[in-house]
Amino acid sequence: MRILIADDEAIIRLGLKATLEAMGHEVVGVAADGLSAVELARTAHPDLVILDIKMPGIDGLEAAEAISRERPVPIVILTAYSSRDLVERAAGLPVHAYLVKPIRPVELGPALEIAISRFREEQALRQEAADLQEALRSRDIVQQAKRRLMEVHGLGEEEALRWLRARARRERRSMREVSEDVLKGLPPFDNTPSA
């Protein structure tokens, strides 16, 4: 896996890099501050990002938010602080795992796996929500076209729906595409649509 590391302590960066490489990962970027981490994420295209919370400039949580806004990836937060307010702040952001320093290699592997798993679940939910939104938009368009056929051609509701279905089958197009044509007045319909 291609991983980006950001920590303001050089010793932590070196140790983390060595541990990750020993685990078989490729470290594609190392940053000492949050802004550099955001820039590196832009150019290195990591599969996962590990960020320290306390860094100069923008902190790890701000960097996590900026990185996720541009190109969502799994994010693991490292910190020497386990204060409740930091944990709560991290929980409200696109953070997929949270580790308290000093990091032991035995903890790092599972944290990466959990982060990847949570990220995938999050992405699947986003896709499902987008698919549902698209289905609702399609349904609304079909409903509008059905009403148009009922008003313009005097069809009953079932008759208008049958007409849309038959046209979609005949033209090998989706009901939404046929409905969009009806709403645009394309193609010109004769005065007696028939199933």
Predicted stretch roles:
Residues 44-50:
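Active-site beta3 strand of CheY-like receiver
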